[in-house]
Amino acid sequence: MGTFSLNGNRSRISALCLALLIQSGGAFAGIYDDLLKAIEGDNTQEVTAILQRGMDVNTVDKSGNTLLMLAVQKGNAELVRFLLTHRARVNARNQYGDTPVLLAALKGHSEIIKLLVAAGGEINPSGWTPLIYAVFEGHEDVIEFLISKGADIDAVAPNQATALMIASKNGHLGTVKLLLKAEADTDIRNPDGATALKWASEGGHAQIVELLKEAGAEQ
């Protein structure tokens, strides 16, 4: 039985750069090319200089990815901080529905997600949530932070699974412990009747099975 993962659809920076170069023309393409190179090179000073030449901080590509999203994916906290102070839209969504907070959660960038949430980034948006994104990859520091900020522990994702169900299926023992400590509901079922305990059992995750049973879970 496999695990849940989002990585296959999220490694898009190289393709994004190419798409930007193809779709843009003239001076704008040249400036954007310089801007992307500066972001890739963690050159906050150069990014600052380019934006001062008139580039909109909320410029997006054809997929709706903003400069803030690129900086988040790159893990550049300094650049994220700079963009936020220059009114980058913290809850913008790209065509995949991702926000900067969602991307930070998926990548496990704990410092960055704290900056984004402090700037008004949504913790409990509709659809996929930052908590569930972090749970996919077992980013425990991010998970712990989101729980402390009021993340909905039992939110049901578009795949009809909760964070506890996903963590149990993927075998993330530490994550399961955090979710149970936060009193996640052990008995939520998906439309097929599956529970966190059922998925943990099918995946052969004996320690998680034991934890769930101790918490009163039913299969």
Predicted stretch roles:
Residues 46, 78-79, 111-112, 141-142, ...:
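Conserved ankyrin/ankyrin-like repeat signature
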